Amino acid sequence: MKKVRVITAEEAALMVNDGDTISTGGFVSCACPEALSIALENRFLETGHPRDLTLFFAAGQGHRDGTGGDHYGHEGMVKRVVGGHWDRAPKLGDLALANKIEAYNLPQGVITHMYRDIAAHNIGTITHVGLYTFADPRNGGGKLNECTKEDLVKLVNIEGEERLLYKGFPINVCFLRGSYADEYGNCTVHREIGPLDVTAQAQATKNSGGKVIVQVEKIVQGGSLDPKLVKIPGIYVDAIVVGSVEDNMQCLGMPYDGALTGEFRIPVDAIPPIPLDAKKIIARRAAMELPQDAIVNLGTGAPEKIANVAAEEGISDKMTLTVEAGGIAGVPYGGTQFGASANAMAILDHNVQFDFYQGGGLDVAFLGLAETAPNGDLNVSKFGTDRKSVV
């Protein structure tokens, strides 16, 4: 293998051209390639380029404070956004609500599978997920505003069954986060909360003829990494950027915690209790519905506090709590560390976790919502103007 190019974040930003489709890694506030996104934002603010980008991501990225996806939230920088969760990037949400960008909200798990299908050069991702919801073309096809015209979702009939076809498209550049890279570009994610989508995103970009750029903590001798820990092989990687300590935080603004990577386990009673407020009361009532030995998914918002309640009550080991980022068992964290799990028994790829979810493997799920109607209809996709965000 040839040695990989090691460049600065500013040099990486120059590899992005006007009109490119760029995919970014990360899950909420965790594993965000901040050095790369900051450099690209600065280049645009200084020169007006690159412009008219298409931004493509699965989980929302950032902390509603100008980080993550908000680095792309400037008029003219992006022309289209295709995302699974917008809430963490309110600047992007504002552009969508103002009809200044084309905007799509597609199911998060479907996007994780789209990466795989783009890599495999499949015609698209065919699934039952999204039928009869806002992602169904009969109900808007995931379009969020009036200026969004192109249909990315098509209703198809296969063997007499309705399915949705989510159309794939090439990815020109992807920005990813790794932990260590060797001299040949092989990258681990052993200090991140999980592998997330890095393998699939890198494959999709490489097989689109695009450029894979990975931000890491450090570079080590070639061939010295445990091959079982390498999630981005060097054959996919075009360039490595070594980020600063601040830009390589495990989760934004949070120091490294080995309990979230499986490096060590912590006593459950060492996890600080959360304050008693309205959301904790909701979580305590919801926790009363936790079946013993059930496989559980906890969503963001009030549901994430159920994990804290279970830990406080000493019942975390009575069921298996999971989060879509990939954690199996343990205690899922909330807030800035949502997506991470302390004391996990396993940490899977994001798309693999969704394979299990979409096939009905869960016994129960506790999910957040914006509005509910008396008949049980739920709005989980658009909040009011006080939030100014699209989920």
What is the predicted function of each stretch?
Residues 1-391:
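Conserved alpha/beta enzyme-core scaffold
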